[in-house]
UniProtKB/Swiss-Prot annotation:
Membrane-spanning residues: 16-36, 48-68, 105-125
Organism: Neurospora crassa (strain ATCC 24698 / 74-OR23-1A / CBS 708.71 / DSM 1257 / FGSC 987)
Molecular function terms, GO-annotated: NADH dehydrogenase (ubiquinone) activity
Membrane topology type: Multi-pass membrane protein
Keyword Magnesium: no
Protein name as it appears in the record: NADH-ubiquinone oxidoreductase 21.3 kDa subunit
Amino acid sequence: MAPQGDDTVFQPKDAIKSGVSGALFSGGAGLLMASLRTSMKKNNVGSMHVFTHGGGTIISFTLAGGIYRFAQQASANLREKEDGWNHAIGAFLGGSVMGLRSLRFPVILGFGAMAGSVVGAFAFSGGLTGWGRDPNVDEFERKEAMRLNRRRPVEETLAEVGEGRGIYPPGYQERRRQRLLEKYGVEVKPVSADPNVASA
């Protein structure tokens, strides 16, 4: 189970702003869906066909996204908690809006219950961030601790990968010169790209 809530003071958020941004985002998704449906038509239709025949889809998506975000933030502000129940309440109301096109009450409740249960379970289990992650730990500090914990010594990396190809440990040039001298009998003189350093 994901950690639900914490001991910090709840900071209320602007529900209207969240609702408007959710409506714009989901309205764009509805416009994309209506555009895709229009582009799949076999007969040639005009550009306004997206709005005349896909207007219901665009409006449904816009209302569902706006109501979901508004209800989620409003319930969080009223309950003064940030948990999965807020997402479930918002998804229930947003899903009910998606069922309004059928004009049948059981369908409206079914869409709302399905959306609320799926989104609520998703949020309750931690969503995309995972159920085991502590919300009180800073993400940067967590990644730095993981890097320090899992960092391998340079000698081990060099033993597996080898030298060259951008990996130049101390003493690489001398070892390279020695290998070329032993293998091919060619002596390579050290050259520096720095004009201030005199070559030997």
